[in-house]
From Swiss-Prot:
FMN binds at residues 10, 16-18. SUPFAM superfamilies: Flavoproteins. It catalyses: 2 a quinone + NADH + H(+) = 2 a 1,4-benzosemiquinone + NAD(+); N,N-dimethyl-1,4-phenylenediamine + anthranilate + 2 NAD(+) = 2-(4-dimethylaminophenyl)diazenylbenzoate + 2 NADH + 2 H(+). The keyword Flavoprotein applies. This is FMN-dependent NADH:quinone oxidoreductase 1. Its EC number is 1.6.5.-, 1.7.1.17. Belongs to the azoreductase type 1 family. The gene is azoR1. GO terms for molecular function: electron transfer activity; FMN binding; oxidoreductase activity, acting on NAD(P)H as acceptor; oxidoreductase activity, acting on NAD(P)H, quinone or similar compound as acceptor.
Length: 191
């Protein structure tokens, strides 16, 4: 059975287009679903986290292990998933702070990627990501969209190169067209 990790980054629980899109995508794909709602506190990295992360695992104190416990859980969720479905609202041309905090918690050298003589290598190969993008005025893929390229790069960096974007962009300009485009892209996922 397919295991899906659904990640919702919108600060809005009600009326969120990206959450609506992730719901539709997950319903279409079916399978076992783990939901990670990033409106619950995902802490930003701090000095204690950095120190714990760069201490070899077998040398970490109990406090350092506790410091990394949420990060370990988040990484395990990604490792267990076959498909990630990520809700990506574009806030001020970029990703929400909560999504950036999640990325910081899961992008760990020696855990989800490693450095080699030829450069970094992602360790999460063989997974798929579907990123549901919603924006009020920013056109996905445009020169002022710093979110979709960032997500494609980060996912590729950790080894997830099969990335599909479902976009409902420019919702404040033409909501009907935005929803229609997203629906067409969602239907294509079933093909």
């Amino acid at each position: 059975m397919t295991h899906i990790l659904r990640i919702d980054a919108s600060a809005r629980r009600d009326g969120s287009v990206s959450r609506d899109l992730t719901t539709q995508i997950v319903d279409l794909l079916g399978g076992e679903v783990t939901i990670r709602d990033l409106t619950t506190a995902i802490p930003q990295l701090d000095e204690a986290w950095i120190g714990a992360n760069f201490t070899p695992a077998d040398q970490r104190t109990a406090q350092q292990q506790e410091t990394l416990s949420l990060s370990d859980t988040l990484v395990a969720e990604v490792q267990a998933a076959d498909t990630l479905v990520i809700g990506l609202p574009i806030y001020n041309f970029g990703v929400p702070a909560a999504l950036k905090a999640w990325v910081d918690q899961i992008a760990r050298a020696g855990v989800t990627f490693q450095y080699t003589e030829t450069g970094p290598k992602g360790l999460l190969e063989g997974k798929r990501a579907i990123v549901a993008v919603a924006s009020g005025g920013t056109e996905a893929g445009s020169d002022i969209d710093f979110a979709t390229g960032y997500m494609r790069h980060v996912l590729g960096f950790i080894g997830i190169t099969d990335v599909t974007f479902v976009t409902a962009d420019r919702l404040m300009v033409d909501p009907d067209a935005a929803h229609k485009t997203a629906q067409t892209q969602i239907e294509a996922l079933a093909a």
